[in-house]
């Protein structure tokens, strides 16, 4: 949705709850993304989530978009299939939201909005020719288009599931695991 979040969000929430045959009294928690993302969109979502949480005395948990996407990669994959995980999210601008984690899920380059060329300068300081890099997130293709030739062989093939954008299921799984 490009515009109109403020007027659309509560009716969308009410419709989803109604269609699920649940009521807010059935909820044990509410999860909301805390960014990165559009400042206005984040404020609207956080205000709606906080309003529902306070009104219905339900715990509220904030989830980073990077954390929500990263949780798709299971523990076995982390331990065996790559050295670094790049989470690249579409910012709907020229830059991307990018974060880099190691195979233990520890942040090695903190996330934020960054030009991919600037990011690759930082990344090159962390890798050698044997470092394997997995890319996930809906900005992965854009990131790889700008990858320097001298490190391109470090990147693992991207599967289709890894290209999917963040969705509510990712946020819910992450919140459930953190609760």
Regions found by a protein language model. Give the residues of each.
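N-terminal beta-alpha supersecondary unit
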Residues: 1-34
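Surface "functional belts" at beta-alpha junctions
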Residues: 59-165
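Residues at secondary-structure transition points
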Residues: 3-8, 39-43, 47, 64, ...
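DPxDG-like acidic metal-binding loop motif
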Residues: 31-65
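Active-site catalytic microenvironments for nucleophilic, acid-base chemistry
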Residues: 15, 55, 72-76, 103, ...
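Phosphate-handling active-site elements
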Residues: 19-25, 54-63, 80
